[in-house]
Amino acid sequence: MKLLVAEDEPKTGIYLQQGLREAGFNVDRVVTGTDAVDQALNEAYDLLILDVMMPGLDGWEVIRRLRTAGQPVPVLFLTARDGVDDRVKGLELGADDYLVKPFALSELLARVRTLLRRGSSLQVQTSLQIGDLQVDLLKRRATRGGKRIELTAKEFALLELLMRRQGEVLSKSLIASQVWDMNFDSDTNVIEVAIRRLRAKIDDDFEVKLLHTCRGMGYMLEAQDEG
């Protein structure tokens, strides 16, 4: 699942991004309302987490512009203001939930998962499949041929990225930015090691191989015709 966090306070933003990633989510973060609108209209997200008070555009204006543009992505508001009028305003503008700061990460995660299950006005994708490899996005589980595959959070995020873009060759730089949130360094072998470990888990025990190396270009997940 891919989430967008719009939070201008650095400490809170980093805390949210790290906590959500450790829970297995793919997370992008912006610090202004203007960037939140641009990202949400140009990228596919399963959920937006918006701070109400942000520079540029506030959270109210962000959701107003998104809904006007026909973007129905679920929205969870974060705010330090606990007034009934504020909660009502957010919900009337099209927000799906409202959480008051300070909050416990466990409560935030519970609300995020509830919104993803509910799907709001979207049909949220809850599973991915290629060949006999299946991924349950809500339970964060992977199976192949009915056999459970144990994955770390990073391995799951890598597999989810490859499955969402199956048939595409993904470069090391793209994988590094999407899964590790870092710029690719040619001196590090973190991507190769992660791919090797993932391949050992999803391919080594099976005749049909799904994870392919495209030399000089990157990696691709595809159920290629053996014939």
UniProtKB/Swiss-Prot annotation:
The keyword Transcription applies. Residues 2-116 form the Response regulatory domain. Member of the two-component regulatory system CopS/CopR. Involved in the activation of copper resistance gene operon CopABCD. Phosphorylation of CopR by CopS would convert it into an active state to induce expression of the cop operon by binding to a specific site on the cop operon promoter (cop box) and possibly by facilitating the binding of RNA polymerase to the cop promoter. CopR also binds to the chromosomally encoded cop operon promoter. May also be involved in basic copper metabolism. Phosphorylated by CopS. It comes from the Bacteria. It is found in: Cytoplasm. PANTHER family: REGULATOR OF RPOS (PTHR48111), TRANSCRIPTIONAL REGULATORY PROTEIN CUSR-RELATED (PTHR48111:SF41). This is Transcriptional activator protein CopR. It holds the Pfam family Trans_reg_C. The modification 4-aspartylphosphate is found at residue 51. One of its GO terms (biological process) is regulation of DNA-templated transcription. Residues 125-223 bind DNA. Keywords: Activator, Copper, Cytoplasm, DNA-binding, Phosphoprotein, Plasmid, Transcription, Transcription regulation, Two-component regulatory system. It comes from Pseudomonas syringae pv. tomato. GO terms for molecular function: phosphorelay response regulator activity; transcription cis-regulatory region binding. GO terms for cellular component: cytosol; protein-DNA complex. Its main location: cytoplasm.
